[in-house]
Each structure stands twice: as structure tokens, then as C-alpha cells.
Amino acid sequence: MKDFFLWKGAHDLAYASSIASTWIWAPAIFVASSKAYYDGLWGFLMFLIPNILTLVFFAYFAKMVREKTEGFTLVQAIESAGKNQKRLHLAVSLTVLICSTCVQFLGLHLILSQWIVNSELVSAIVVSTMALLMVGTSGIKGSIQTDVVKYVVMFVCGVLLLFNTDGSTINLAGHSGKSVGELWKTFGVATTIGLLSAPYVDQTFWQRVFSIDKEKVFKTFIMSAMLFGLIPLIFGLIGFYSGVGEIQVLFGNGILSGVLALCVLCALLSTLDSNLCAISSIVCKEFGGSLAIGKLSMVALLLASSFLMILTDITIVELFLIYGTIRTCVALPTILIILDKYDKQRLFYATLATVLIAPIGYLLGGEYNYLFTIMALCLPILGFKNETQQIELCKTGKKNW
């Protein structure tokens, strides 16, 4: 069963390509292009830079965790926090996996609706079948191996599309007319916080962290940041040069549309099959399920995400920002637990309050919803405890003001 959830001994470049491919996620292609077209250089950078920095910052944290512990899941790494805190983390992890999978479905449907089919259900069935074929029998090993191929395909497809973009001049100002301040409030804040907090609660990252040799974790994640940056950069350039904001419209219904569909499909499958591996590892390692039950959980995840897509009218960017706020709720608690700088009871109640308030506040907050994303990041600091200071107080019996 272990080989299904961790794959040791792969080449560094294979791990880095897998991390980059998983982090790209299909909608990043659309977001990079549309932000460049509509919001210009500033809007594009508000998406690109946080994405790259996320992998760079997490490299330091992942190295520290691997030096301290071995395991399969994030929840195993925070065992000391107690059952209630673990349940909160599990609930958020499962919610994020459902939302992330739904976002991948939405990304592919944007392409298929222009090219082949209009049914969201058909789109979900097609990509679900492909993802299950990739990892249903081999698990994380199959995911990492195919990610290498998928990254190469994405890069080649992106270059082909860039050289066939119908535009002779570059527009760095964008077409929306929004100021930098407006962009920062409506997109930049939630995006930056949501992205920077993402890996700490994302089981797809932790499976790779625990698969990589501890001496190579830092180097591998830095390499993945560089590999990742190339893909949105290519599609951002397409947005700067193009005369259309929607990339799926830009390349019409011909051969180039097929190239775009292949690129999106590879990005989607990288994240999707990683999500399937993540859900199975959580079910088996945290709930004691058998390998067969773990595989059934993959199907359950696909069904739940399909229903979310079909029964709502939510857009890619909206869902991305919403679940970004949700996963932010447990990012700081994860860091505090790993650093052993927390009070168990205070951290639990601070995390619980954050999980209950921030996502709902974001949904109802209108133009001020970004404030709830900030709250999701900051409120858990109430659970902070400086253990070193506590020890000094016990020794001296007095406070130093």
C-alpha cells in the first residue's frame, strides 16, 4: 500500500516537473492570459509573482518538516495538535480537494464547449475517466511519471500558440481601465494570500514532500518554481499580444484550438490525478480504509466535484478565490504547529472561528470580501504561544517588560 501513496527514488527533475505541473492547474492558463489582456502588466504580475513565491517559500518549510518527521499526510505531521485540530484540518483539506477538482472540470469545459461538446456532464466524465486510468492502479508513482510528459506537452503547446498569436504589438496597459489599487483590492489581495497559504494545507504537496529525499527537498522545490513560471509567462505574453480576452475564443475552432485543448487537458490532468492520489491517501491513512476503499474515494471525489459544477453557475475565478480563502484558514495554524509555537486550546478555537466566519464573510462581503481573506490569514495568530518565553518566565519568576 505504501508504494501507492509515496514514490521514492525518482529523478529530481521528475519531482520538480510533477510539482510544477500540479501547481499550474488548468485555469491558470486562462487566468494568466485574461489578466494580461484585461488588466495589463500589473494584473498579470499579481498572478504570476505570488505563484512563484509560493513554491520558493514552501521550499524552506518543506525542508524543515522533512528534517523533523516522516509520514504520508499533513495531518500526520500535526499529530501533536490533538484530535479536534486534526478534524478541522481534515475538513478543510477535503473541501479544498472538491473545489480544486471542480475548478479543473470548469477549465476543461471551457475548451470542450468551444470545440466538441456543450454538456458539463460529458466533460466531467471524459476527464474523470482519463485521470482514473493514470493513477487508479499505480497511485502517486503514475501521477509523477505522467506529469513529466504533461509538462513537456504544455510547454511545447504554449510556444506553438504564442508564435501563432494574431498580434503585432504588445499592450501592457490592459483593457479594463482599472487602477493598480482597484486590481489589488478585487484580485491581488485574495490571490496573493490564497496562493501563499496553499501548499501548507494541500495534500498533493505533502505527498511529494514525503516522497523526495530530505536532502533534496529544498532544491527540488526551487527548481519547480522556475519550471512553473515558464508556462503562465508564455500565456501571459499571448494575452499581451492578442486582441481577444478569452483565449479559447482567440484560437477559434481549428488546429490551434486543438493545441490549446491538449495543453489545458495536460494541466487539468496533472492537478486532477494528484487530487485523486491525495484523497485516497487521506482516506487510507487517516480513516484506516483499505486500498480498495481509497480507490473508491477517488470516484466519490469526482462525483462530488461534478455535482458542484453542474448544480452551480460559479466561475473559475470565483471558485478559485473562494477556496483560496478556505484553505488560508488553516495555513497559519499548520505553520504554528510545525514550529511548536502554539497553545492547543486557543489555536483550536481561533481556527474554528476562522473556518466558520471567513469563507461566509468572503461570499457575502461584496467589494470588501478581500478583508475576510486577510482575516482568514491573521485570526489564527491568537493561538500563538512563545514556548521559549514561557520557559524563561518559569525560571526567573518575573516578566521583562
Each model region followed by its residue ranges:
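Selective recognition of specific alpha-helical transmembrane segments in multi-pass small-molecule
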Residues: 92-102, 153-163, 191-199, 214-243, ...
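Hydrophobic alpha-helical segments and their helix-loop junctions in multi-pass secondary transporters
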Residues: 98-105, 109-122, 126, 130-142, ...
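A generic transmembrane alpha-helix motif of multi-pass inner-membrane proteins
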Residues: 345-401
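Membrane-interface "cap" regions at the ends of multi-pass membrane proteins
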Residues: 1-30, 135-141, 151, 157, ...
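Membrane-interface helix-loop-helix modules in multi-pass membrane proteins
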Residues: 6-70, 193, 205, 210-244, ...
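Transmembrane helix-loop boundary segments of multi-pass membrane transporters
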Residues: 34-47, 105-121, 141-150, 246-253, ...
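Helix-loop-helix module between adjacent transmembrane segments
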Residues: 45-135, 194, 266-274, 291-293
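Hydrophobic, small-residue-rich membrane helices and short re-entrant helix-turn-helix hairpins
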Residues: 71-79, 138-147, 200-233, 247, ...
